[in-house]
């Protein structure tokens, strides 16, 4: 009820202004009596995945807390894990505004943010100050002005800087809002990137005395053959996990709706069916050898269960959290 009232107010604002205000409020109120409005004690539902122990299988997807400013707030809400970022080596402002749109009737969101963030060094400073007990994932990407043929260098820079502080590292090669980025999902380009990442992972494991798993985040807009090829690359390069999926460019589910033709990636309920199908295809190809984090339209216990029945070991929420608030986390965890 409280969240519904808060949402009504936030939804009167421009979508990005509402997002920024929410982040500011979480920063301001966490650790004060006001955080009782969103602090939750949830039952333990431990899951072993990628060599880590998650207190429950429900995580916050990347994109909501790009700079790691609100880790303590999301930890207080009971998430089993929180994925911050996407972060790039250098700060960048992202694409021109407006760049974030609600499709309220479909419980969807379209964004063309373009990896706006304050840079990896800023994120690390925020992580170092935060106190939390959930698993922390850090999602890394490349700067827009880095040529795609030099993209691996950006991932390696970020990886080196976040390794010590991350529970796992998510490698984002599937955002539709950075020109050319999705080409890294295919063939030799993918294999070359994964070889470099695994080499760096081994080097950093020796340096820091701990193994930090790598998870690759993929797009929903892939053919069955492309998914099969990605799976072969994941297996061949011993990647620790796969996150399925990022946002979609497909507008079939929202045709005719206000904002439906805005450029960018569509998330939320309209993505639910396709992302679950990708999870199913991954499970069939990977045969349980590589864990799957399912994301895309997880807006209820039923949707979370569908992802897990399709083969997801963990699930993440983003748009569903915007529409339903912290109660969504509670409902999923309690009913699993």
UniProtKB/Swiss-Prot annotation:
This is Dihydroorotate dehydrogenase (quinone). GO terms for biological process: 'de novo' pyrimidine nucleobase biosynthetic process; 'de novo' UMP biosynthetic process. Belongs to the dihydroorotate dehydrogenase family. Type 2 subfamily. It comes from the Bacteria. It comes from Vibrio vulnificus (strain CMCP6). Its cofactor is FMN. It is a peripheral membrane protein. Binds 1 FMN per subunit. Keywords: Cell membrane, Flavoprotein, FMN, Membrane, Oxidoreductase, Pyrimidine biosynthesis. InterPro entries: Aldolase_TIM, DHO_dehydrogenase, Dihydroorotate_DH_1_2, Dihydroorotate_DH_2, Dihydroorotate_DH_cat, Dihydroorotate_DH_CS. GO terms for molecular function: dihydroorotate dehydrogenase (quinone) activity. GO terms for cellular component: cytoplasm; plasma membrane. Its EC number is 1.3.5.2. It is found in: Cell membrane. The keyword Membrane applies. Catalyzes the conversion of dihydroorotate to orotate with quinone as electron acceptor. The active site is at 175 (nucleophile). FMN binds at residues 62-66, 86, 139, 172, 217, 245, 268, 297, 318-319. It catalyses: (S)-dihydroorotate + a quinone = orotate + a quinol. Monomer. Substrate binds at residues 66, 111-115, 172, 177, 246-247. The keyword Oxidoreductase applies. NCBIfam families: PRK05286.1-1, PRK05286.1-2, PRK05286.1-4, PRK05286.2-5, pyrD_sub2. Its main location: membrane. Pathway: Pyrimidine metabolism; UMP biosynthesis via de novo pathway; orotate from (S)-dihydroorotate (quinone route): step 1/1.
């Amino acid at each position: 009820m409280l969240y519904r009232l808060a949402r009504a107010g936030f939804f009167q604002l421009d979508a990005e202004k509402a997002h920024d205000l929410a982040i500011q409020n979480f920063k301001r109120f966490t650790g004060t009596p006001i955080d009782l409005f969103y602090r939750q004690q949830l039952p333990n539902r431990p899951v072993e995945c990628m060599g880590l122990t998650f207190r429950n299988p429900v995580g916050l997807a990347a994109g909501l807390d790009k700079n790691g400013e609100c880790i303590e707030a999301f930890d207080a809400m009971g998430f089993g894990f929180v994925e911050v970022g996407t972060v790039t080596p250098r700060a960048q402002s992202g694409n021109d505004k407006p760049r974030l749109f609600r499709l309220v009737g479909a419980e969807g969101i379209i964004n063309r943010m373009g990896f706006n963030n304050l840079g990896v060094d800023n994120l690390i400073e925020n992580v170092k100050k935060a106190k939390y007990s959930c698993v922390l994932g850090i999602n890394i990407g490349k700067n827009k002005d880095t040529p795609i043929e030099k993209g691996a260098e950006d991932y390696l820079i970020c990886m080196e800087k976040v390794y010590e502080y991350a529970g796992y590292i998510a490698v984002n090669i599937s955002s539709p809002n950075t020109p050319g980025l999705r080409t890294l999902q295919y063939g030799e380009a993918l294999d070359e990137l994964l070889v470099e990442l695994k080499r760096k992972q081994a080097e950093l494991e020796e340096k820091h005395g701990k193994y930090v798993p790598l998870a690759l985040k993929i797009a929903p807009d892939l053919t069955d053959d492309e998914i099969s090829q990605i799976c072969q690359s994941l297996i061949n390069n011993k990647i620790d996990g796969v996150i399925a999926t990022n946002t979609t460019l497909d507008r079939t589910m929202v045709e005719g709706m206000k904002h439906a033709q805005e450029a960018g990636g569509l998330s939320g309920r309209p993505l639910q069916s396709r992302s679950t199908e990708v999870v199913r295809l991954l499970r069939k190809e990977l045969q349980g050898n590589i864990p799957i984090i399912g994301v895309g339209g997880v807006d209820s216990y039923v949707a979370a269960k569908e992802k897990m029945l399709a083969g997801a070991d963990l699930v993440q929420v983003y748009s569903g959290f915007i529409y339903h608030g912290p109660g969504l986390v509670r409902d999923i965890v309690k009913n699993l």
